[in-house]
């Protein structure tokens, strides 16, 4: 735990990030969630972070009001990520302390954050699993 207090995001983040575009379909996203077992994907357009999409965001697309007609599964899977992503995601910098990221995760109830450098480029992602791995070191 002692080392954790002094660590920065860059020391714990996942550097190779899988991303999706705003045009990715819900069906493609479902397959990506299954294949990679990630909870979140950054949404990129023209090398810019435009949002994030989580498993929870995806599952919300399957919810409908009881008085409405039930949409066909195939139609739901054609929805684009842009229709249900979080457009103003929280993000952190590589130089932020892990203790601050942990505090942000608790305050925002988010389990991951994209990591952007000073130029706004996506350089990684930090998850609660990344933090847990570091606590024991």
Descriptions of predicted regions:
Residues 1-137:
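Tandem CBS (Cystathionine beta-synthase) repeat/Bateman regulatory domains
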